[in-house]
Curated annotation (Swiss-Prot):
Cellular component annotations (GO), alphabetically ordered: cytosolic small ribosomal subunit
Gene that encodes it: rpsO
GO biological process: translation
Protein name: Small ribosomal subunit protein uS15
Matches recorded under InterPro entries: Ribosomal_uS15, Ribosomal_uS15_bac-type, uS15_NS1_RNA-bd_sf
Subunit structure: Part of the 30S ribosomal subunit. Forms a bridge to the 50S subunit in the 70S ribosome, contacting the 23S rRNA.
PANTHER family: RIBOSOMAL PROTEIN S15, BACTERIAL AND ORGANELLAR, SMALL RIBOSOMAL SUBUNIT PROTEIN US15M
Length: 89
């Protein structure tokens, strides 16, 4: 269920601002989005996995908080990230 190292590194490299950037909101939101997409695929097979569904809701809430923070700090970066990841506002 956990993302493998190569997939995680690819997501980080695609959204990092500089070498070794793992803490910026863009990278964190991108990692959470990848994890959420992975879990939604899991739920297509395992419809009654309610325990993991609560974890999914926590991840979605965490992503929402980071997006709200980014929107408050820099609207241009927020809009660019939303468009790049294909998320709704």
């Amino acid at each position: 269920m956990v993302m493998d190292i190569e997939a995680k590194k690819a997501v980080i490299d695609a959204h990092a601002k500089h070498e070794g950037d793992t803490g910026s909101p863009e990278v964190q939101v991108a990692l959470l989005t990848a994890r959420i997409e992975q879990l939604t695929g899991h739920f297509k097979v395992h419809k009654k996995d309610y325990h993991s569904r609560t974890g999914l809701l926590k991840l979605v809430g965490q992503r929402r908080k980071l997006l709200n923070y980014l929107k408050k700090k820099d609207v241009q970066r927020y809009r660019a990230l939303i468009e790049k990841l294909g998320l709704r506002k």
